[in-house]
């Protein structure tokens, strides 16, 4: 996982996840804009295989935010979440009569960007 920090944005990137980008987008669309704690609850309860790598990525981004920037995890939210297609892994499966059948395993790159929520000043 590649982690970048720019301003108050904390970015975490996971590359070459053995998963279809279409299937990963199904989960990423559910967590975009949610708070950190709400995102972890959603990912724990969803029954999809892609939830585990996304969970690890969100957890890593939050750990980087607290360790490197000193930000509170409870105040952060998912500002941007993207899935891009990666390289296609190509293999051949042997078939009857000496033939072979191509197998294409899709991979994807997942990017999570955390931001800290702005606290509005109290008006007395």
UniProtKB/Swiss-Prot annotation:
**Keyword annotations for this protein?**
Chloroplast, Plastid, Ribonucleoprotein, Ribosomal protein, RNA-binding, rRNA-binding
GO annotation, biological process = translation
**Matching InterPro entries:** Ribosomal_uL22, Ribosomal_uL22_bac/chlpt-type, Ribosomal_uL22_bac/org-type, Ribosomal_uL22_sf
Compartments it resides in:
Plastid, Chloroplast
Query: Would you tell me the Gene Ontology cellular component terms?
Result: chloroplast; large ribosomal subunit
Q: Which domain of life is it from?
A: Eukaryota
Read off the Pfam families from this record: Ribosomal_L22 (PF00237)
Q: Name one GO molecular function term.
A: structural constituent of ribosome
Which coarse location class applies to the principal site listed for this UniProt protein?
plastid
Family designation: Belongs to the universal ribosomal protein uL22 family.
What's this chain's function? This protein binds specifically to 23S rRNA.
HAMAP family, alphabetized = Ribosomal_uL22_B
Quaternary structure, per UniProt, is: Part of the 50S ribosomal subunit.
Report the protein name in the record. Answer: Large ribosomal subunit protein uL22c
């Amino acid at each position: 996982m590649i982690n970048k920090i720019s301003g108050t944005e904390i970015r975490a990137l996971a590359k070459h996840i053995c998963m279809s980008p279409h299937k990963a987008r199904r989960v990423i669309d559910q967590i975009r804009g949610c708070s950190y704690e709400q995102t972890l609850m959603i990912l724990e309860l969803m029954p999809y295989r892609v939830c585990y790598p996304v969970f690890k990525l969100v957890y890593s981004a939050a750990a980087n935010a607290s360790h490197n920037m000193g930000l509170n995890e409870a105040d952060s939210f998912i500002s941007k979440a993207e899935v891009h297609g990666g390289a296609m892994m190509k293999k051949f499966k042997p078939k009857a009569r000496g033939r072979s059948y191509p197998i294409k395993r899709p991979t994807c790159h997942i990017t999570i960007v955390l931001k800290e929520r702005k606290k509005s000043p109290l008006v007395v």
